Structure formats: structure tokens, C-alpha cells
Amino acid sequence: MKTLKFYAIFLILAFIMLGGCKEDQKKIIKTEPITFTKEGELTIYKEQSDSVLVKYNIEIAESDYETQTGLMYRESMELDQGMFFIFPDVLFHSFYMKNTKIPLDLIFIDDKLRIASFKENAQPMDETGLSSEVPVQYVLELNAGQRKQYSLEIGDRIAFIRM
């Protein structure tokens, strides 16, 4: 009788131990990369001559969700692409680079569609605030270096169309 109890206890302990040795199953979550969605085109014109400086395909951020997430979690952006933010009011707008993996130039644009100020070479993942120097209604995010490459200046004009 003692041996039967011994074997019963042994079997119970063996099952408990084997169950406890089960290897943890780690879930692998596959995330899809966020891709660019062309929603319009934007052209920047030189202030004095009205000559075309550069044209971009733009993704438009207009809703609260779109303006809050912007280019977060994106791995890259083509040189002819940008994120164009449209705000309902002319205000001092501030951005930061939280969860943004691409260095950016921020072009702040007033309600008359003129470049009002810049923040150049904003660094990925930096949560320092990047504010416009004057009240603006639009902001264009481009790959870092675009402002210098195309000699964009305060007063240059933009025009955009939605697709």
C-alpha cells in the first residue's frame, strides 16, 4: 500500500515538473511597414521670380490622429515625398521626433502659403519641441537636407493640390 501511494505521489510530482518545464511560447508579432500614400502634389516657388524650385508628392495629415502620428514608425521616405500638415487655425505649432526614425527638415508655412520659418535636420527619436517662430497654418516635413539642397528661403511660396 505504501508503494502505491509512493508511485501515485511520484507520478503527480512528475507531471507537475514536466508541465513546469514547458518552454515559454514567445509570440512573434509581424508588423507591416507603413507605406507612403500619395494624396496630393506640392510645388515650391522662388519668392522673387516665381520659378519652380522643387515639386513633391505629399501625404496629407489633417485629422487629429494624422497630425499626432505624422511620420512616426516609418523606416524611410523618398526624396520626392513629404508629409503636409494642414491645421484649421493659424497658431504657433510645435512638433517633436518621438518614434520618428527619419531625420527631417520642417518647413513652417503661413496662411498665405508662404514659408515662414524652418527647423532643419531634426534628429530621429528626439523629443525636444520644434516650434514655428511665427503663427502658421501648414507644416511640410521633408527628408533632412532638402531646405539647403533647394535653397528654400523665408518668403518662398507653395501651392498644393489634392488627388
Predicted regions located by residue number:
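C-terminal motif of bacterial Sec signal peptides marking the signal peptidase cleavage site
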Residues: 17-20
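Bacterial N-terminal signal peptides that target proteins for export
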Residues: 1-8
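Compact, glycine-rich, soluble single-domain proteins
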Residues: 22-163
